[in-house]
Amino acid sequence: MVDLKTKKVIIIGDRDGVPGEAIKLCAESAGAEVVYAATECFVUTSAGAMDLENQKRVKDLAEKYGPENVIVLLGGAEAESSGLACETVTVGDPTFAGPLAGVSLGLLCYHVAEPEIKSQIDPAVYEEQVSMMEMVMDVNAIIAEISEYRNKGCKFL
């Protein structure tokens, strides 16, 4: 199982899901070192792709800390947008529009609501920051989508 305390955490939250700041509070409650946190509007970006500036930051941070030392935590409200974000940080930008086009970082990537991550977060912090969104998200579909890309593209499982 992944241990958040041993990783540099990059957070890509979702305006319509779990915001970056909420995920940051959760990760910090688990003892993680958060090196970047942002909140995207996946509906606003072209085809639901990851924001180009966030792609650049992810790439730069993976190079700085070593991809084996980095984990990306997502807060997407929908399976498809979460899957696209996971695909981007593992096998590369599927839209071929950003800095990660053709770049396979192979980063470890999870949604904040996945049991492997949720179990490490202080329950009171999770309740306050994530639980309301968890009730309206299709968590099983999100996990299935992210797991597919993580298992296919992550080099550090």
Swiss-Prot record:
Entry-linked InterPro entries: GRDA
Residue ranges of the TM segments: none
Key words of the record: Oxidoreductase, Selenocysteine
Enzyme Commission designation: 1.21.4.2, 1.21.4.3, 1.21.4.4
Active site (UniProt): 44
Catalytic activity annotation: acetyl phosphate + [thioredoxin]-disulfide + NH4(+) + H2O = [thioredoxin]-dithiol + glycine + phosphate + H(+); acetyl phosphate + methylamine + [thioredoxin]-disulfide + H2O = sarcosine + [thioredoxin]-dithiol + phosphate + H(+); acetyl phosphate + trimethylamine + [thioredoxin]-disulfide + H2O = glycine betaine + [thioredoxin]-dithiol + phosphate + H(+)
Any one GO cellular component localisation term in the record: glycine reductase complex
A GO molecular function held by the record: glycine reductase activity
Keyword Oxidoreductase: yes
Family: Belongs to the GrdA family.
Function: In the first step of glycine, betaine and sarcosine reductases, the substrate is bound to component PB via a Schiff base intermediate. Then the PB-activated substrate is nucleophilically attacked by the selenol anion of component PA to transform it to a carboxymethylated selenoether and the respective amine. By action of component PC, acetyl phosphate is formed, leaving component PA in its oxidized state. Finally component PA becomes reduced by the thioredoxin system to start a new catalytic cycle of reductive deamination.
Quaternary structure (record): Monomer. Component of the glycine, sarcosine and betaine reductase complexes, together with components B and C.
Name of the molecule in the record: Glycine/sarcosine/betaine reductase complex component A
The organism of origin for this protein: Treponema denticola (strain ATCC 35405 / DSM 14222 / CIP 103919 / JCM 8153 / KCTC 15104)
Gene that encodes it: grdA
